[in-house]
């Protein structure tokens, strides 16, 4: 998409504002809105200056100036703003060099794609993430010196079977772990998801399906088609934006927290991926599960670096409340065809062109640019160093006896473990200057503040366990 096309969109749709969007280190989209009349030739060459010191984990106040460089190919109409507004995604550049800022997630993703091409291994990596989310009616939480609490409510929640409502309790709701695929009225989110799909398609995503997920209280998923890595990361941000805003329009509140409910399934973001060169799928072959030797080496790299990857794919303290056995959480670092208890699955496909792997431990609070790039770099390290993943595990890993289970490596058990693993195992990420030691150090420092904050806060459960001891 060219400047001319952007200008024609502005004229055709009587656009009044341009919303410049970028993603911070934690994966949250930020934005800056400017009048549409500021868009001209210079705008796409010079960008828009902004204060980078206001973004956590980025610049200090003494060197705060940074450049938002709009990517004209990402222009699309915003479906929610009152005034006609055009969204344009931006890379964050250093003003002195006009090169991608080494801590900018989107620039890191683009450098990873460039590194893939320069390696000669492949020219394209495809990603297909599957973010899950909850829709609640009401969420309240409190954290201050006087105490801490949270409360979740939703008309669909299993705990509301005996709740009195003004117009009566209709009784149709999914029980704990009983939400997968029921028809309405048990599935109360059908129309909300359909609206999400309509808007996602208007914004360029290709929707493949939508459905209720396993958990009670409104766990849902919209499945969208794969794309190249940075484009799919852009689409993941669009996906989250649409989910949260459509929920708001319907009087609901959406969360991508991995584990908001105790005792029911959490939300994951399984990541499907494959490599290709000159249009040929390099993961298709005659090895286990129809994979190529290259694909097996890629899996070997993911398994070898999994705990370091967890720092990007599972970047919150809440992430590790999902990654526990017994809740369809893939904690064991093994691979298998079809077996959903393994952390890496080889899906059944209709043709060899669709051959791919599915990494199942990521969750939807991952920054998609960083999580996708880190997984690619781990896989490429596996290919370069011919890291074989060993034998596949086709048995149900959730039911293994303890003596067998302890022989299988697992993902990190906490955010602190994951951050320490990344600190010790980072070299594979720095190949080709994709990640820098500076960007990794800044990431570690930012997320360690989360670990420390949670560590220092008394938990309500501790009062139940210890108050009268």
From Swiss-Prot:
Oligomer of 12 subunits arranged in the form of two hexameric ring. The modification O-AMP-tyrosine is found at residue 398. Mg(2+) 1 binds at residues 130, 270, 358. Keywords: ATP-binding, Cytoplasm, Ligase, Magnesium, Metal-binding, Nucleotide-binding, Phosphoprotein. It is an enzyme of class 6 (ligase). GO terms for cellular component: cytoplasm; membrane. Binds 2 Mg(2+) ions per subunit. GO terms for biological process: glutamine biosynthetic process; nitrogen utilization. ATP binds at residues 208, 272-274, 340, 345, 353. Mg(2+) 2 binds at residues 132, 213, 221. PROSITE patterns: GLNA_1, GLNA_ADENYLATION, GLNA_ATP, GS_BETA_GRASP, GS_CATALYTIC. SUPFAM superfamilies: Glutamine synthetase, N-terminal domain (SSF54368), Glutamine synthetase/guanido kinase (SSF55931). Catalyzes the ATP-dependent biosynthesis of glutamine from glutamate and ammonia. The keyword Hydrolase does not apply. This is Glutamine synthetase. Its main location: cytoplasm. The lineage of its organism: Bacteria, Pseudomonadati, Pseudomonadota, Gammaproteobacteria, Enterobacterales. Residues 105-469 form the GS catalytic domain. It is found in: Cytoplasm. Belongs to the glutamine synthetase family. Its EC number is 6.3.1.2. It holds the Pfam family Gln-synt_N. Residues 13-97 form the GS beta-grasp domain. The activity of this enzyme could be controlled by adenylation under conditions of abundant glutamine. L-glutamate binds at residues 265-266, 322, 328, 340, 360. It catalyses: L-glutamate + NH4(+) + ATP = L-glutamine + ADP + phosphate + H(+). It comes from the Bacteria.
